[in-house]
Amino acid sequence: MTDRHDVVIVGGGLVGASLAIALARQGVEVGLVEAAPAGQMPAVFDQRNLSFAAATVNALTALGVMQQLRTPTGPIRRIHISRQGDFGRVRLEAQDYGRATFGQVVVARDFGEALEARLDGLSGLTRYRPARFVGFAPDEAGHRALRIADAEGERTLHARLVVAADGTRSAVREALGIGVDEHDYGQTLFVARVRATQAPDGTAYERLGDDGPTALLPRGDRHWGVVHGVAREQAETVAALNDVAWLARLQRAVGWRIGRLVASGERSAYPIARVVAQRLVADRAVVLGNAAQTIHPIGAQGFNLGLRDALTLAEEIARGHDPGTASRLAAYAARRREDRERTLAFSDGLARLTANPSPLLKPVRSAGLVAMEAQPSLQAFLVGGAMGFRGDVPALCRGEAA
């Protein structure tokens, strides 16, 4: 097993594994440092419902990942956005934009299994698992040295480029001296699978409430994926609800658009915070995925943004012999600036506005939704971002061979 690679990725979650696949298919020698042992899924691959934008579906199909899914996905053909207690609403139809779907709903665990199946078939990929990042070692010319700990003890890896894809509290990002800007939304997100008297019909509902958003996502197994935000101080109470009380709470939040809610699967809870890296690159290093930006789930843009980051990086690496040069990384950061800043601003602004219960903001919220419904240009801006086609989009996301 060699300890020298073109690229070492620390973190085998959604973005890290996707980048490893993209680079390996380009012939790049990749080392992947993973916390989970062989045969065990990383914790991120749970029962969460992932909303893949159309651009993301294009890219993952080109990478051979979507074909590995063993369970059906749920197509999103229309989007319905409203706010509890306000009169405005937005309704979007994919066919109005020349598309069959806005994207697909995929269960995180199913996606993890598909990634694993794809990783298994790659040459040029060395997997270190279970292993953890310990720190950086003295560098050699043209390489970055990093220390990892695995079952055999500590070892030093050498890479022309190190990628930090190790999550919101990234140890690699911290070791690089990259600071973060943080905001705690004071909310907790509950995720579950529910069954209703009406099966999914391709509509994704986003219901905005005083304490946070509630989304209903059309899964491919005739269930709905529910994402329910509550104020942090209510989280323990909501977690303690029995299924009858839990379903009643959801029914009040979403109304009767999908009929009566009749059953719920296990609930998981996640605190919601915004953690944004102050810069994306360092000396022969890049931060990606949640290590680069952990954003509010409203609009379901987190993984979609992270994948566009990863594929843009893969494109830049393909353009030169040395993936870690300062000019290559500067070009990457410049290409990602517009999409990243717009997505961060949209997600954060919408989260803060819609979660603020002040009656003074009610006319603004309602007028905003009414204006969105009436103005095709505003809808087109929303749709372009939601589908992942706004700004400098990687070729695989556009459905082009690369």
Describe each PLM feature range.
Residues E236-G324:
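FAD/FMN-dependent oxidoreductases across multiple families
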Residues T2-R4, T61, L69-A175, E182-T188, ...:
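Conserved N-terminal helical subregion
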Residues D6-L32:
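N-terminal Rossmann-like FAD-binding beta1-loop-alpha1 element of flavoenzymes
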Residues R48-R70:
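N-terminal glycine-rich dinucleotide-binding loop that anchors FAD/FMN and/or NAD(P) in oxidoreductases
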Residues E315-A402:
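C-terminal helical "tail/cap" subdomain of flavin- and related membrane-associated enzymes
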Residues L60, H143, R147, A151-T156, ...:
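Conserved FAD-binding catalytic core of PHBH/FMO-like flavoproteins
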Residues A24-D46:
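Glycine-rich FAD pyrophosphate-binding loop
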